[in-house]
Amino acid sequence: MTLISRRGFGGLFGASALGLAMPSLAFGAVPKVVVIGGGAGGATAARYLAKDSKGALDVTLVEASKRYYTCFYSNLYIGGFRKYGSIGHNYYGLAVNNRINVVHEWAASVDGAAKTVNLASGGKLSYDKLVLSPGIALKYDSIAGYSPQAQGRMPHGWTSGTQAQQIRNQVLTMKKGGTFVMVPPPNPYRCPPGPYERASMIAHLLKERNPTAKIIVLDPKEKFSKMGLFTAGWEKHYPGMIEWLGPDAHGGIKSVNHETMEIVTDLDTFKADAACVVPAQRAGSIATAAGVTDGDWAPIIPATMASKADPNIHVLGD
């Protein structure tokens, strides 16, 4: 993993890296940078573009939500180590302290030829450079039976929002000795250790409140991130509570049924009292709308994070 310092990040996304010509400032034109997506990546990019350029860039952040709940630390909330409010953040300080224009609207599409972002309200934002931090979109149809409706009883909790609360509440209300079933996503996906961190935090909660309960992880993968560390930790802290089953053991995930709370594999059917089902993923929809995707993801030039499809668009995130 390559670690980028704050100074390095600012250099990576500085005016020169974005290809913005500073001589134009002599004629009074301030280059415009629009950032779409106010999650960790987009908000950080907007902050340091504005801060490190010292007014040389006109930075606008487009984010539909007025409050952002982080996916990271949501597992600590589920486990009882943090309050839900602690993972929520508004954009007031970001806007005021860094002189960023924050627009709380949906970005509907991007016209790369005209260098324009089209807002759902009908408004338009012009740019010299565009930074996309699109997050992820869920491929619900990657698991038969899973859908936006199914997530009401089998939440994924893989995008910011209230589903972390839903998962915690379902765990707290499980019957004594009940079964929690987790279905992690196939590669590639956001935060590779995340499903196993979540299983650990749910085990911590159950150990305190429902110690005879069981967690079954039905994994489509043969191995997972930091597998040795997680399995050793489970055996040490939650012996006998977490059972991880790979495809060799279950034969493959066939379908889920949110009404009966059943997960069907090739070799068996698992009945859950509570469940977390995380489907396959792709780049967020705005990346497709901007024309920078190839299949599910958005190829970039690593040195500058510029899109291979459009040199005036930089893509970052998961």
Roles of regions detected by a PLM:
Residues 13, 134-135, 279-280:
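Glycine-rich, N-terminal phosphate-binding loop of Rossmann-like dinucleotide-binding domains
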Residues 1-17:
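N-terminal secretory signal peptides and thylakoid transit peptides that target proteins
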Residues 27-101, 186-228:
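Beta1-alpha1 glycine-rich phosphate/pyrophosphate-binding loop at the start
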Residues 15, 24-26:
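Cleavable N-terminal signal peptides
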Residues 97-109, 114-117, 125, 204-299:
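A Rossmann-like FAD-binding core segment of flavoenzymes
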Residues 119, 132-133, 182, 277-278:
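Redox-cofactor binding/interface segments in oxidoreductases and associated redox assembly factors
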Residues 148-176, 270-318:
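FAD-site-proximal beta/loop scaffold in flavoenzymes
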Residues 134-209:
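Glycine-rich dinucleotide-binding loop and its adjacent helix/turn
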